[in-house]
């Protein structure tokens, strides 16, 4: 392989590894473990409005937002308009539930402006189970930590909304 092509590949591999090291997935990983996981992830660049995952589609990929943002959005059937339910930014994970259980996505993931994400397919992570089980364990811990934060936030929002609706605790 020509030297220039090899350097390009090494540069992209180094960039990908650096992006992975700075992500929530790598919080508990050593440098060597990051390198192993880095071989499994890919980088995807999206333009404004690109749909990363379609509403109702099953998808086995986990995404880490490297730059830009993703809208968690549903398309209104009657009008075709998009309704944004939540916005995910740099450092956030997306698609974690579909990654874990393969169920169809309740909402789509759409790029807000130019967006770059790291992609990890479930099958690729599972391929490490026998030879690198610690990496799989630590990545899954990272995913569950993120899901736990989301669930806590949703519980707090539900509580605040309930208090508001029923005018509980004299806050409203």
Regions found by a protein language model. Give the residues of each.
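Cytosolic regulatory regions built on CNB/CRP/Popeye-like sensor folds
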Residues: 1-172
């Amino acid at each position: 392989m020509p030297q220039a092509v090899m350097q390009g590949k090494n540069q992209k591999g180094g960039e990908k590894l650096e992006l992975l090291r700075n992500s929530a997935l790598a919080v508990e990983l050593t440098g060597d473990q990051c390198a192993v996981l880095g071989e499994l992830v890919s980088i995807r660049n999206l333009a404004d409005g690109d749909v990363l995952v379609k509403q109702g589609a099953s998808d086995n990929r986990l995404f880490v937002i490297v730059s830009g943002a993703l809208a968690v959005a549903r398309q209104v059937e009657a009008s075709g308009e998009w309704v944004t339910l939540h916005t995910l930014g740099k450092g956030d994970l997306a698609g974690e539930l579909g990654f874990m259980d393969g169920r169809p996505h309740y909402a789509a993931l759409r790029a807000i402006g130019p967006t770059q994400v790291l992609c990890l397919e479930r099958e690729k992570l599972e391929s490490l189970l026998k030879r690198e089980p610690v990496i799989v364990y630590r990545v899954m811990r990272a995913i569950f930590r993120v899901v736990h934060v989301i669930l806590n936030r949703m519980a707090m929002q539900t509580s605040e909304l309930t208090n508001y609706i029923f005018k509980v605790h004299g806050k409203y």
